[in-house]
Regions:
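A short, N-terminal amphipathic alpha-helix
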Residues: 33-49, 61-62
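Short, high-confidence coil segments that cap the C-terminus of an alpha-helix
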Residues: 47, 102-104, 131-135
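Residues in the short beta-alpha loop(s) of Rossmann-like NAD(P)-binding domains
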Residues: 31, 54-57
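Catalytic metal- and UDP-sugar-binding loop of GT-A-like glycosyltransferases, i.e.
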Residues: 110
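Short phosphate-binding loop-to-helix
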Residues: 57-107, 117-120, 124-127
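Conserved core of the sugar-phosphate nucleotidyltransferase
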Residues: 87, 91, 115-203
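Conserved active-site beta-strand element of glycosyltransferases/polysaccharide synthases
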Residues: 206-209, 216-217
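N-terminal nucleotide-binding beta1-loop-alpha1 segment
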Residues: 2-21
């Protein structure tokens, strides 16, 4: 990887959670989930700044205790159930740049609710971005169900068909193109694509593949068990 690049890592922690209230600061192994993400970012040794963005007072008051370099108050319009996350990430990057008078080359976001990722996953995703022409990198695990084989959509009249059709029907899942479940563990961008476009996917987006056992994205009480 290019050692002279400036890198920032954000951990965006929204106060509201419909599925699991307060899930971002629920404890796992004795630490709030967002604190685990902060410590993973620090252990990677990749980042010039690790920034936590939140609208939750509890998080804003304690994030720097767990190692964050800076906290950003997430605007109310970016913290509702209907708000997309990417604008909040871009806002955190811009705010940190203004505070530290720095401009970052690579922007990374770690989802607090993906605690099973390891430092090697963060390093691998960043390396994939920096050694290719990718505008962004997502992470995911190979999916067990396939839109070419055993995922269907209901159309007009209630009739169903496979979600994606090929000229020749796929009769074995193994013969279908590989598909992946996004796991939200790591997102990586070249800065301009995040800050100017505020999107995840571009024509040159790549995926860093993780094993299923590290791909948990906590979204229910059952996931904590």
């Amino acid at each position: 990887m290019e050692g002279l690049r400036m890198r920032i890592c954000t951990i965006c922690v929204r106060a509201g959670s419909t599925g699991v209230p307060g899930k971002n600061w629920r404890e796992l192994s004795g630490l709030p989930l967002y604190a685990l993400a902060v410590q993973q970012a620090k252990k990677s040794g990749l980042f010039d700044r690790v920034v936590v963005s939140s609208d939750a007072a509890e998080v804003l008051e304690n994030a720097m205790f767990y190692g964050a370099d800076y906290v950003v108050v997430r605007p109310p319009e970016m913290a509702s159930d209907k708000a997309a996350k990417v604008p909040a990430i871009a806002h955190a990057v811009r705010t940190a740049e203004g505070h530290f008078n720095e401009t970052y080359d690579v922007c990374v976001d770690l989802d607090a609710t993906s605690p099973l990722r390891i430092v090697a996953d963060i390093v691998g995703a960043v390396e994939l971005l920096e050694t290719t022409s990718a505008a962004s990198v997502i992470t995911g695990a190979e999916s067990h169900r396939s839109p070419y084989f055993n995922l269907v959509e209901e159309g007009e009249g209630g009739f169903v068909s496979t979600s994606k059709a090929l000229p020749q029907a796929v009769v074995r899942r193994q013969d279908a193109p590989k598909t992946y479940d996004m796991n939200a563990a790591v997102y990586v961008w070249q800065r301009r694509f995040l800050v100017e476009e505020e999107a995840v996917f571009f024509p040159t987006t790549r995926i860093y593949v993780m094993p299923p056992e590290r791909s948990l994205d906590i979204d229910s009480e059952l996931d904590f068990k």
